[in-house]
Amino acid sequence: MKQSVLRFLADLRFAISILLIIASCSVIGTVIEQDQSIEIYKLNYPLTNRIFGFLSWDIILKFGLDHVYKTWWFLGFIALFGLSLFTCTILQQFPSLKIARRCQFFRTTQQFGLLKLSRNLGNLSLSQLLFRIKKNQYSIFQQKNIVYCYKGLIGRIAPIIVHFSMILILIGAIFGALNGFKAQELIPKTEAFHVQNILSNGQLTRIPKVVSRVNDFWITYTKQATVAQFYSDVSILNTEGNEIVRKTIFVNSPIKYNNIDFYQTDWNVIGLRVQNDTSSILQYPLINLTNAGNKVWVTWIPSDSEFKKGLTILVDNLQGYCSIYDESGIFVGNLELNETFNLNMPITLVDILSSTGLQIKTDPGILLIYTGFLFLMLSTLISYITYSQIWIIQTNRQIFVGGNTTRATFDFEIEFLKLIK
């Protein structure tokens, strides 16, 4: 019973079936948005108009289709596929390698009929033939008048390395799904923050108590006044508030600390600081008018003490100025930092408040995954090494010689013909 179960797990058809199931689940995870809020699913998958007649937000949440790659059943399929690979390696690949290492002598000349490449030699001595074979880097084993030769045995290890690398990748994926997390924070510059806004996390995840600070944030622009790159000066602090690590990050250049990555992902303008005629500094919030494309923020600043008249302020960049419009919507000028504008009452632009969007994530399985892919590439190179075998039987004045190879048949035929020439 035990042997039959293990052989069933090691069967190639079973492994392919599990792989197809995993691929189908991955397609579902690609089509359905992952790790979104319930409101998003209620909006896109309503109960009244079910997709395909059955798919709605309640079904998605019930079966965990909103986080497919972290569900117990998806991780179970991955574990089952890994178990199938491991069983196949133990029951099939290692025995095949063990057989390949043995001296597989041909005892009778009739066995040469099973080979596609064989010859009967009468004009070449055995010592000459063995010298040529040895010169071609073959290992030679001889018992009286029978000889067995092979080379490229390392090529037979490639399938084992493939299985090993895939098992490493699967273990890394499971470990990362169970212990990793992803968070998104929008932090005003000069502010310190903890990791709080968790977007997704695994069942065994422990959120690190890391204190960080955004020291500064700025944007560089192209000649066409479009955003070229945005930067955040980020510090990692210890429990006493002292700086441990500091780095200026930008898109695709994160700061790393204790296997936690801080990525630059977004930015926002949140307010204006204005000094009025009484030298008081007031802060006005900015509202974003667009969700995509060109970003524009707007606020309203009163120009009299009764709040009946005012100025509309527009900000569309972080180049240190804002645009001013009067009550009729007529453009009256730009106001730069530390510049004073006078319309009914003087106002001075003190600062444009910005915030940076940071994605904070950790994936403890990434090292295993990278190592697995490294071995996978190594196995690809090793698989190009041809495993070739040559058998020889000497009877009276005749020499029977034949050969076989796992790949590169044409090259082996040329080599074989040169050996017996």
UniProtKB/Swiss-Prot annotation:
Q: Name one GO cellular component term.
A: chloroplast thylakoid membrane
Q: In which domain of life is the source organism classified?
A: Eukaryota
Which UniProt keywords are given for this protein, alphabetically ordered? Chloroplast, Cytochrome c-type biogenesis, Membrane, Plastid, Thylakoid, Transmembrane, Transmembrane helix
User: Which membrane topology describes this protein?
Assistant: Multi-pass membrane protein
Sequence intervals crossing the membrane: 12-32, 71-91, 157-177
What subcellular locations does the record give?
Plastid, Chloroplast thylakoid membrane
What's this protein's family per the entry? Belongs to the Ccs1/CcsB family.
Q: What does this protein do?
A: Required during biogenesis of c-type cytochromes (cytochrome c6 and cytochrome f) at the step of heme attachment.
Specify the protein name.
Cytochrome c biogenesis protein Ccs1
Q: What organism, scientifically named, is this protein from?
A: Trieres chinensis (Marine centric diatom)
The organism that produces this protein has a lineage beginning with:
Eukaryota, Sar, Stramenopiles, Ochrophyta, Bacillariophyta
- Protein encoded by which gene: ccs1
